[in-house]
Amino acid sequence: MVYSYTEKKRIRKDFGKRPQVLDVPYLLSIQLDSFQKFIEQDPEGQYGLEAAFRSVFPIQSYSGNSELQYVSYRLGEPVFDVKECQIRGVTYSAPLRVKLRLVIYEREAPEGTVKDIKEQEVYMGEIPLMTDNGTFVINGTERVIVSQLHRSPGVFFDSDKGKTHSSGKVLYNARIIPYRGSWLDFEFDPKDNLFVRIDRRRKLPATIILRALNYTTEQILDLFFEKVVFEIRDNKLQMELIPERLRGETASFDIEANGKVYVEKGRRITARHIRQLEKDDIKHIEVPVEYIAGKVAAKDYIDEATGELICPANMELSLDLLAKLSQSGHKRIETLFTNDLDHGPYISETVRVDPTNDRLSALVEIYRMMRPGEPPTREAAESLFENLFFSEDRYDLSAVGRMKFNRSLLRDEIEGSGILSKDDIIEVMKKLIDIRNGKGEVDDIDHLGNRRIRSVGEMAENQFRVGLVRVERAVKERLSLGDLDTLMPQDMINAKPISAAVKEFFGSSQLSQFMDQNNPLSEITHKRRISALGPGGLTRERAGFEVRDVHPTHYGRVCPIETPEGPNIGLINSLSVYAQTNEYGFLETPYRKVTDGVVTDEIHYLSAIEEGNYVIAQANSNLDENGHFVEDLVTCRSKGESSLFSRDQVDYMDVSTQQVVSVGASLIPFLEHDDANRALMGANMQRQAVPTLRADKPLVGTGMERAVAVDSGVTAVAKRGGTVQYVDASRIVIKVNEDEMYPGEAGIDIYNLTKYTRSNQNTCINQMPCVSLGEPIERGDVLADGPSTDLGELALGQNMRVAFMPWNGYNFEDSILVSERVVQEDRFTTIHIQELACVSRDTKLGPEEITADIPNVGEAALSKLDESGIVYIGAEVTGGDILVGKVTPKGETQLTPEEKLLRAIFGEKASDVKDSSLRVPNGVSGTVIDVQVFTRDGVEKDKRALEIEEMQLKQAKKDLSEELQILEAGLFSRIYAVLVSGGVEAEKLDKLPRDRWLELGLTDEEKQNQLEQLAEQYDELKHEFEKKLEAKRRKITQGDDLAPGVLKIVKVYLAVKRRIQPGDKMAGRHGNKGVISKINPIEDMPHDANGTPVDIVLNPLGVPSRMNIGQILETHLGMAAKGIGDKINAMLKQQQEVAKLREFIQRAYDLGADVRQKVDLNTFSDEEVLRLAENLRKGMPIATPVFDGAKEAEIKELLQLGDLPTSGQITLFDGRTGEQFERPVTVGYMYMLKLNHLVDDKMHARSTGSYSLVTQQPLGGKAQFGGQRFGEMEVWALEAYGAAYTLQEMLTVKSDDVNGRTKMYKNIVDGNHQMEPGMPESFNVLLKEIRSLGINIELEDE
């Protein structure tokens, strides 16, 4: 395997055995590709903005005299970049400009004669843009649009599984779901009549819709029934015989022909009888006349002589009718073929209950159902029905819907019209009747072939179309109204409705969510989330068990493990590692093709529908070196079932063992040894880990850590290879390799790093360079680590030395005992950044003012403010301190004579303002790290704002001039090379100042051209620099666009350092969570024979009942990894020669049975080996991929190599007594996370505070400064003790007895500790509620 320069710094030993056929794809592609499709110009007009415009335009006027046509669109450049948008609190978006053409036709002239054409570009609002990491910045906060899993458009056949009717009869139904438009349902009722519903309204007999489509009764029966023909010959009744139709019936008469009796009366007709009839080629048999009674006529029979209708279609025949027909000369009678087995008389019965008999009455009936209470007219009824399913504006199946519709009806072509046709409706009814007759199956709604993904692009396009449709109405009005000669397209279009629709979607849609930014993994998981909730989806309350359950088609598409616990379980899922969506939006997963029993490396992506037809082998099937299966019988999946197949039946094989799980679950080592419920908790808790101050890579990982860290976008990744030319804390400069440069550029890449910024979850985002000067780098190398990454690998927690043993009850019920050393070494110290904002508004009584001159506040409180009244950077503040001084004018109050006198003497004005300063919230203390002041245009900036502005200008100028210097240096080095190669002596050049080099001329024409090109570039560079500087200056000095009525906003950022303490929640990666119970002194912790104490003591009883054995294996493997690190450390300390070091590390990498990773340290230079050893001295990182991890024997080998006991247990000694514990204890290294459930955020105490308005009880919760509820169970406890007075106090004065609590307060102040309980307010509420029901209750005083 070839390692790039940075990967060589620390190589993870991989225990994976299966070859990696397919690299992990880019993890954010589902978001980025979808949005790209939305905004890029699509010449076909299938997707995105183009499709939306084409579906609405051209807009014609009602008269048809003019139309507004769409030509093209373009997106402008965003005004601010992403970072500026976040600071200013605005949306990162680009203006959309659309070229429209207004065409006016001649009125009197023949059709299509153009009178005038006007073309113009029109502004149509702003379109939010996606950042490179798949997020949107809306009003300054990062948001993610979650993809939705919804029912695919098409037709679905389903049944109620016998739950609707009391008899338990199964009722079948069919539903046609369009992408947009009305739903059409067909359903059977318990009497086996077929009904139709439109948009889930009142049901009508299904034949109404056929009559509305202009079918007569005769045609309807013709469509759905086969015919039985009777002929009257010589006063005898003969029936045309199709033997197959008799199967299973009991003969009601002797069936005979040509004198031979085939079936005797009363006998059951069997397959043998039918074969005989067919063999003898019997076409007619004679039947008794009574046999025809009860049969149903298939068409109208008219007396040709009189024109009288003797027997209408669908009428039951009787012997009298038969006589009439015979008399009127009808010798051939067609009846409907029905039986109880597989040809039910459903449509015939439905025609009988159908109240309508022609097209008009059917249309009226439909109109009445859709618009109850409106008088129907013929035109209204016709246009309503036409618009329901047959109008392209109102109804669209979409390409997906048409494909699913045609597949369901077994048609060959998969493309077609987006509206329904007569055939579509009839075929759906036919298939539904077939299913009722026992032919065909109902669909599985939860099959992933029937559910599709709607991603960002598609949802944004739909919203945009909604906005356009709103505009369309207005445009039609305008085209009809006015004087078209003076109008331009710009006057027609109002961009407000469009931008409102888009803004509403991105700002407040259920699927537009505040990004979970705890750590890189939570970001990636959030972007790969798939929700069944949201508009057009399910609701939590209505979703049953089936929808939430794992389905066989989830394999490789949706993760069976990662889903939230609680009411959303199973409704919110996560995309599997390799899954992607196809052109129709269905999820597909990759497989390796198997041809003639050989597994090839050819990859095919299959959707859930296609997968059903194949036999697919598991990824862990054993192959020989030629790719043949080793075993004769292979475990495979086929049609959703798992079973054994012979090896020549296999069509495909899984790509990877981690194909099944999501990114979060693929980061859990030894996942295969954990119970699924605990794995779910483990995957969910990794997303809640807070980035620690010093990231520490996991010793035991799965090999996915690098992919997650790089794809999440929190690290700085090299766009092109080169060498590091300059590096400091805030920027890295790379001199690009010659072969990767574009012609005529300076060849310098500059990466500016993010420093101490606040994330959405108030954690700290900070990037730190991990390359040093002069290092060669390649494209894709990690240059700087972000939060929770270590040398380009995800590092959510810390490796802790853990022991599984009880310790004085301090780890009872999942508590965790932690050593003081963990706190001293700042292992779990985290930085949290809080943003506090102070807004100064214009009020009715005058403007609020930000000032240090605050009434009734002592000097001490103002000590941290500058003269503008804003706290200075670096101040240490605690709860209650003033950050920004602000005064608000208050209304003039009636002054007392004394105050008037004081006013007159001192000219005092202090009393007409009140203090409304921004203070630090209670319980928060930290350091001010940044202050930003935003001032409205036209309001004078205060001193602090000007200082900040000046600082920003200086910084911008410094940054840009440094950038210019670096680029200039790059350019001049190339000019130097050209001049020297063109014959100028190097010594002379060195003496000449750089600026004058360009004045030199060369004789070689080609070199001279190169020189001139470079000179041009130099000028362009300086010009560009001036332009950039000017733009920056403008942005910094211009006023800010603030909300109406706001004059100034001051934002103060506080950094809070949180050490770990009792009450904080910690967890491993296997769902093993707990709360810290005690921080123990180092000297009291259990230690081994060398005196090394453990960091954490966990309860061994937490393992067996929860069945997450993965944590034990991780502990053992972590111990081995650390043991090898210790040996390398010892060798480095003894300064042994590199050869020995190389040999030992090579042994460690080679260990393990047939592992896929091949590391050859002989190709490494001595320097590289030393650097590798330096990075391995704290432990050798190990990857044990999911379902393909290290085996027990390999862990033992590794322990042996590290000179450790293979049992994984060692003798420990009690730190307090020095005595040995009675048995060996499992000790090792486990990766522990600190979760974002910190005791500091939860601890809270209340004295007298706010009360609820209605019940007068104290509020609840920390945010409301609320109390703890003394609930039902606590009342029972006091009742059980008979503590009557305590109970009375709890229910009255301590809670909601208003008079009682004020009296109590007074009494306490007076030193008299008496209480006089009265009536609790909640009792009054109860009385009022009963009275509101009309029952009067009066309380009588005894």
From Swiss-Prot:
Family membership: Belongs to the RNA polymerase beta chain family.
Keywords, in A-Z order: DNA-directed RNA polymerase, Nucleotidyltransferase, Transcription, Transferase
Gene: rpoB
Summary of the function given for this chain in its UniProt record: DNA-dependent RNA polymerase catalyzes the transcription of DNA into RNA using the four ribonucleoside triphosphates as substrates.
EC code: 2.7.7.6
Protein name: DNA-directed RNA polymerase subunit beta
Pfam families: RNA_pol_Rpb2_1, RNA_pol_Rpb2_2, RNA_pol_Rpb2_3, RNA_pol_Rpb2_45, RNA_pol_Rpb2_6, RNA_pol_Rpb2_7
InterPro entries membership: DNA-dir_RNA_pol_bsu_ext_1_sf, DNA-dir_RNA_pol_bsu_external_1, DNA-dir_RNA_pol_su2, DNA-dir_RNAP_su2_dom, DNA-dir_RNAP_su2_hyb_sf, RNA_pol_bsu_bac, RNA_pol_bsu_CS, RNA_pol_bsu_protrusion
Organism: Klebsiella pneumoniae subsp. pneumoniae (strain ATCC 700721 / MGH 78578)
